[in-house]
């Protein structure tokens, strides 16, 4: 398992909360981050593994 950090973004795209998660691969981590973001007040998220930005998904309105 690999460790990832999901940074929840506010409407100005600043991180207001960080949640760790462990997943088998990037694809699984992106799915998990989407689920966590959908169940929060976030306006998007960034997914990081160490210093690598795996995925960034700001919400579009």
Question: Where are each of the predicted segments found?
Answer:
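Short aromatic-glycine-(Arg/Gly/Cys) micro-motifs in beta-strand/loop hairpins
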Residues: 1-17
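A general secondary-structure boundary signal
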Residues: 15-20, 36, 44
């Amino acid at each position: 398992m690999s460790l990832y950090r999901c940074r929840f973004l506010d409407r100005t795209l600043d991180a207001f909360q960080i949640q760790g998660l462990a997943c088998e691969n990037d694809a699984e981590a992106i799915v998990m981050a989407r689920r966590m973001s959908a169940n929060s007040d976030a306006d998007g998220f960034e997914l990081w593994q160490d210093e690598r930005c795996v995925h960034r998904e700001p919400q579009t309105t």
